[in-house]
Amino acid sequence: QAAIQEDEKMAKNKYAGTQTEKNLQEAFAGESQARNKYTYFASVAKKEGYEQMSALFLKTADNEKEHAKMWFKELAGIGDTKANLEAAADGENYEWTDMYENFAKTAEEEGFPELAAKFRAVGEIEKHHEERYRALLKNIETAQVFEKSEVKVWECRNCGHIVVGTKAPDVCPVCNHPQI
């Protein structure tokens, strides 16, 4: 099934198999990494008392986020929520079953046991991320996002009003904020 999904995704990506696709992937990765670096740099600047420099790093990070989003869209990387949950779960699965385990083995072979342990620990976190995404996907597939078989506590994401029941209200009875 993963191969079928990949084929469907490739059909949406008009750049599939080209150097342009590789360039778009590199642009997306570069902009994504720059965004994260700049948010880290903003934290340091703020801690050191450089509020204006911190704000500039954050503004630039937001610009880089938009650049990354542009390239990711070109690669047909953004779907509906169901497709995004599937892609996220698959990505997390790769990270914990393959990537981090291989990184850990290499780190051990090269004499970095502490780093190997850290790679494995992060791999465990990625496993939980996959499980969470798959549970959310199941909620969509079984129409259990806003309705459960057992009583739950539902909180309005706008005003904080609490409703206890099997179904979230379509509209908050306090602030009239819609469920969706």
Regions found by a protein language model. Give the residues of each.
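Short, Lys/Arg-enriched N-terminal segments with co-localized hydrophobic residues
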Residues: 1-9
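Non-heme di-metal
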Residues: 10-180
